[in-house]
Amino acid sequence: RQRQMCIRDRSKLEFKKVIMDFKNSDFIEISALTVHIGSQIKEVFPFNNCLNFLNKTIADLKKANIKIKYVDLGGGMSIPYDFKETKFPLKKYASNVYNFKKKNNVKIIFEPGRFLSGNVGIIISKIIYIKEGAKKKFIVTDAAMNDLIRTALYDANHTILTIYRRNEIKSKIEFVGPICESSDKFGE
């Protein structure tokens, strides 16, 4: 049976006492550590801080004769949602994880989720109407918020590509769906 313990800040927890309680239990075997440090993290330094924390934790556990076999590093790596955003420095992170793995002789588990699948979807839509507003044009498409709800729910940005060259678009435009709902929009 798997048990989990959340340690937000080791200085606030009597870490050694907890470890000894676990170690002396007939029902608990400590063999893995798992972390979750956030989502859409764009830099490597938070992950490096986490690896340093794990190095210290594994060293403390080793002193108590507890061998960690697995470390689940979770996910958290960001993905770019448009061409302006920079990509996550994966090679640098991978190098740091490799060194951590070698130092601690553990198997690494990742939960990359969005990092692997976040950019694989595409919606192909056609313009069904152009509405002239006072300050901008609205391009009404045959796709709606029910096809891509992330913008309505999270104000998420997605790259919009047109078959026309961008320099041919002279005025501010907003791409929207045909549902009469203020959040049925995809972006400008």
Where are these regions (language model features)?
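Short, small-residue-biased leader/transition segments that mark boundaries at the very start
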Residues: Q2-I7
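Glycine-rich beta-strand-to-loop/alpha-helix junction loops that act as flexible
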Residues: I37-G38, V71-Y81, P112-R114
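Short glycine/threonine-rich loop-to-helix capping motif typified by GTGT followed
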Residues: E43-N49, P80-K92, G118-Y129, E188
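Charged (often Lys/Glu-rich) extended helix/loop segments that serve as interaction or gating elements
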Residues: N96, N105-E188
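Conserved strand-turn element in the central/C-terminal portion of the radical SAM core barrel
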Residues: E29-K42
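Structured alpha-helical segments in the cores of large, soluble enzyme domains
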Residues: S11-E29, L54-I66
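Alpha-helix-loop-beta-strand connector modules within alpha/beta enzyme cores
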Residues: L54, Y93-K103
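Active-site mouth loops of central-metabolism enzymes
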Residues: R8-L13, Q40, V44-P46
